[in-house]
Structures are given as C-alpha cells and as structure tokens.
Amino acid sequence: MPSLFRRLGMTSHVSPLRRRLQAAGLPDTQSLMRLAVQRGCRYYRDTVTGTVVDPGKDRVPDEDLAVGLLHGSWEYSPAALRMGAAMLGARDNDPRKVLRLARMERAEAVIREVAEAGLRFEPTHRFWSCLLEGLPDRGRVPTGVLPHPTRFVAMTGITREGRGIRSQWIRPEELHG
C-alpha cells in the first residue's frame, strides 16, 4: 500500500516524529490507531483490535499522536486519517505545538485541510482559526486523497428539537480514573 506522501506526489523524508513514535513502542499506523482509541477515540473502537502499551502523554503527547496519524510516511489509511483529525481536535491540544510539528514533519497541507474542515463545522472554536493563521496556503490536497470532511464529524438526522442535520466534530472523550 502506498504512503500518503506518495499519493500527494511528495517524497518521503527522515521523520524525527516517526522515529520518536517508534522508539516509544509505536512502530506502525495500527499501533497509533490503537493508542488513539485507548486515549478516548471510542467512536473508532470497532476499527482496530487489540491494545498497545501507552507510553504516556509526557513521552507521546496528543499533538504528536495526532500529527503521527496524519503523517505522510506511514502506509495510507483513511481510518488513520480520520482518527488523526479526531486527535487533532482534542480539547487540550496546543496549536503552537501542532504548528511546529506540522512544519517539521511536512504535514502542513494535510493539517490545513483538516483545520479548514474543523472551522467549517466549529466556526467558534478558536483552535482551528489559530492553526489556519499559522499554516501557509500552498495549494490544495488533491480531491479524494483525504476522507471527505463529513467523515470527521458525527451527524444526526433527528434530534430532540426535531428533524435537521446537526454535526459534531469527533474528538477523544475525556477519560476519568
């Protein structure tokens, strides 16, 4: 299976983030996806099986996990990209850390696309606009490479208020205990 970089027409590079993730016991996309589910991406729990040892947020912060899932050097996986979008929207993420990682990892275009989708569905969430202010607009990701933006949200057809589409960004649930 080709990598996301290959689908984007980019060359792969030696990734410091990928090396850090591998050193933390996360050698591939599947292990990153398992960790995302363990860290609260329960919406995707049927996507992966098994568990992985969580190296801890001090060693692998949620920002690293998000950018890792959206990183272009791994095997291409729409499910990993959807989980990466969810982890990117984690409530306590620092946009400055995400921006630094995006630059360092050549993930700016992908993260910009996700942030644009986030702003479309959550126009008052400051995190998305902070990302967009800090990311260069160097062209679009080709259509069909990333999941459709509606795959990053949960949509309802009928609510207590009646019929109508209500969208909510899928993000990790707060874990207690």
PLM region descriptions:
Residues 2-3, 14-16, 30, 35-38, ...:
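General helical secondary-structure elements
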Residues 9, 13, 24-29, 76, ...:
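Non-membrane alpha-helical secondary structure
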Residues 33-34, 118, 158-159:
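Alpha-helical interaction segments
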Residues 124-177:
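Charge-dense, extended regions
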